[in-house]
Amino acid sequence: MTNDIIIIARHGKPELSRKVRLNWKEYREWWLKYQISGLKKEQKVPKRLKKWAEKSDIVISSSLLRAQESATLASGRDPDFIYEGLIEAPLPSPYLGSIKIRPKSWGTWSRIVWYFGWSDGMESHKSARIRADNMSNILADHSKGGKIIYVSGHGWFNRMLKGSLKKQGWKCKSQNGDLHWSYRRFERQTQKLVKNGN
């Protein structure tokens, strides 16, 4: 029996250095630069992920550059569809005075306060959840008819997509964490395509 398949991968290693210490304001400036940065040069896509991407029927990417470059590097072609709805959920750094820590630490603290409801004017957790539900519907529609869909996205929002897809009945058949080039592979029994007018 044929299955619809969605493979959701995190982008590769970005070019912007994380080897800095920043206060909360500087982290927000760093994040803005990160959002427009591309991939670090001369990196290899894991063999399994590259094989899946090359065999996919449709390649989809977030609208951010690092995701688009990752999609092309993995699949060998430009994305068929690019969605702003797949961008990473925001990271509003909490006001912690002059304390300076690494971007990774800021990311952790920012994600915690965001998760529990503090967004400081950025997209809220509730709104991002709705976005994830909407995007999971779009991805599911693309996969109908036994297609293999490769999606190049971002760490936390990929997790949110996992929850949305599971609510729809998708099964996560394999996954390997949340690091760069990590992935989650989802499958469901093939949904038939419905032609207009029938």
Feature map (PLM): residue ranges:
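Active-site-proximal alpha-helix that buttresses catalytic centers in soluble enzyme cores
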Residues: T2-L86, K104-M135, E187-Q189
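A short acidic (Asp/Glu
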Residues: E69-L73, M160-L165
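Signature for phosphate-centric chemistry
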Residues: L86-I101
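Glycine-rich phosphate-binding loop signature in dinucleotide/nucleotide-binding domains
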Residues: W52-E54, L139-K147
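Domain-level recognition of soluble alpha/beta enzyme cores
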Residues: E26, G169-V194
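Generic beta-sheet signal
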Residues: I6, D57, K147-G155
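Short active-site-adjacent structural elements
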Residues: L16-S17, N158-L161
